Amino acid sequence: MHLTLAQMAVTALLVALLPLTLVWTSSDVSKYRKLVWVTVFLTFDLIVFGAFTRLTDSGLGCPDWPGCYGAANPFLAHEEIVAAEALMPTGPVTVFKAWIEMIHRYLAMAIGVLIVAMLAQAWYQWRRSAATPAGRRADYAPLIPTLLFFAVCLQGAFGAWTVTLKLQPVIVSTHLLLGMGLLALLVWYGCRQDQLITPARTLTASPPAMRRIRWLAGLSAALLLVQLALGGWTSTNYATLACTEFPLCGGELVPPMDFEHGFTLWRELGKTAAGHYLPFSALTAIHWVHRNFGLLLAMVAGYTAWRAWQHAALQRTARWLALTLLLQLATGIATIYLNFPLAIAVLHNAGAALLVLWLTMLNYQAKCQFELALATNATAATHAQHGRKDNTPS
């Protein structure tokens, strides 16, 4: 196992070497900022590829971890994979699925390497900036890179448990949620790097108006977190086609549903906690809750985008957020009516990751605008006070 892990680590280093080389040889003013955004891009790709892995039932394409039948890649395990496929032709193990699963693991480990590089550079800059003013030194604070490092390690652990616990729904759903959380943290950090280089200087709203935008953006992010959990639960329980019409489900607005078994977290895939087969009404409950909570999220996030659209500094992000919401609604409905086509299902997962990206950016931008509005008001008040003093007769 140790040899396999070492061989996979070397593969991950080689995969990570390409983006690292592109970053450090670029003419970008801030190579570190570019590294962060390249990692954001690759993490988004990993989430989409992870959805493809899950939707093609490739999660157990290599039923051990970290390698594939004890080997570092499917080439070295070809005989074992072919033998497993011959024993169960309709099972989860095929050469194609083995490669899908291992590519997913290689890319995940490469992103881990990029985050380690980010962390090392952040600590290096932090130590070098010891003699700078406290405010300037805070720019290099390595808190977020440290959180990213622990998050990617935890994500790797859940990736392993996804395989070793045979696609336990709660483990797979948590793995998906952690991936989205990692993306959000990376986007927040990327926005912070942008802010350090080109600070926001254009004030577009008063503090009360921007406070309302911040509240709406925060609420939308909280609702999105719940919806991501529900979407992951729907996918990992294979409940996508429990309702095959919209807005009705089984010919009813509120069909018969089994919430108790549907939302029991710790159980095997397709089974109740007692080990019986999961009733169809439980799958209906899972799908119905995800669908209707999605409509609630669309209304709240759509209203947030509309309010943010009225401020120039937030307009671009608000526009993309609104378009992504429409994409999600369209792909969600299309998934039902087109009998769950793979391309649409992957696109729906990509849309969820884009919602994470745009809402994280909107929250950060609203925060910066709010702080700028407060600072502008404070400066204006100070100038007014000095003006009154200057006009006071001596």
Please identify what each model-predicted range represents.
Residues M1-V29:
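Transmembrane alpha-helices
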Residues M109-W126, G181-D194, L296-W309, V356-K367:
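Membrane-interfacial alpha-helical segments at the cytosolic side of multi-pass membrane proteins
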Residues H2-V10, W99-A117, P169-L182, A285-Y303, ...:
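Membrane-interface loop-to-helix entry segments
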Residues F52-C62, F150-L176, W233-E245, L329-A353:
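Interfacial helix-loop-helix junctions of multi-pass membrane proteins
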Residues K31, A120-T146, A305-L321:
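Membrane-interface helix-loop-helix junctions at transmembrane boundaries of multi-pass membrane enzymes
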Residues L55-M102, T240-L283:
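Extracytosolic (periplasmic/ER-lumenal) interhelical loops and adjacent juxtamembrane/interface segments
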Residues V29-D45, A141-L148, T204-A229, L314-L321:
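Interfacial segments of alpha-helical transmembrane regions
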Residues K31, W126-P142, Q195-I213, Q369-S394:
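Membrane-interfacial, low-structure loops and terminal tails that flank and connect transmembrane helices
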